[in-house]
């Protein structure tokens, strides 16, 4: 299951991130988005979704939402 399939306002644990880009993986890690970390989808948008990680909110696109397994 990935973030695009997640229910709104339900907390999940990140299982894996498969972006295929080491630089993007490092950026996500710096935001606190890595395996074992809780993540909550705040809302689904046409082009992506808004997520909450470590009390911060981020807008991510659909491609990235599909790369984050929960």
Task: Please give the residue ranges for each predicted region.
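Short, surface-exposed acidic/glycine-rich loop or hinge patches that mediate macromolecular interfaces
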Residues: 19-22, 44
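Intrinsically disordered, low-complexity, charged/polar segments
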Residues: 2-5, 66
């Amino acid at each position: 299951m990935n973030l695009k399939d997640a229910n709104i306002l339900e907390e999940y644990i990140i299982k894996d991130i498969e972006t295929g880009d080491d630089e993007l993986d490092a950026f996500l890690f710096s935001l606190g988005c890595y395996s074992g970390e809780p993540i909550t989808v705040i809302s689904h948008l046409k082009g992506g979704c808004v997520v909450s990680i470590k009390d911060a909110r981020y807008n991510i696109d659909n491609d990235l939402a599909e790369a984050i397994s929960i």
